[in-house]
């Protein structure tokens, strides 16, 4: 029974590490997306300041602000998922080190 429990714990740990790797990759892409939106917004605002306000520019700036907000919201969701996975992994490791899951570490 202990061997089966150890194998299940090891499999679960492997699954969590893979999921964390995927979440971290999504986070990096999300940070790039947010940075791109920030740069585009800054350029649009500078252009508006230099060339003046126009309805088309105002609409573009509003769209860029929405994109930035969406990117930030997506990052918060990714960070929440990462926190959940990290906590689950820490709990699994804690149980393993306390001896309740055998000695596979």
Please report, for each region that a protein language model flagged, where it lies by residue:
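Short, charged, intrinsically disordered terminal tails
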Residues: 2-11, 86-105
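Short, charge/polar-rich alpha-helical segments
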Residues: 2-36, 69
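Non-transmembrane, elongated alpha-helical coiled-coil stalk/scaffold segments that mediate dimerization
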Residues: 7, 14, 21-22, 43, ...
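Amphipathic alpha-helical coiled-coil segments
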Residues: 27, 60-90
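Extended alpha-helical coiled-coil "stalk/arm" regions
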Residues: 27-63
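Alpha-helical coiled-coil oligomerization motifs
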Residues: 35, 42, 49, 76, ...
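Short, flexible coil/linker elements and helix-boundary hinge sites characteristic
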Residues: 52, 69, 94-95
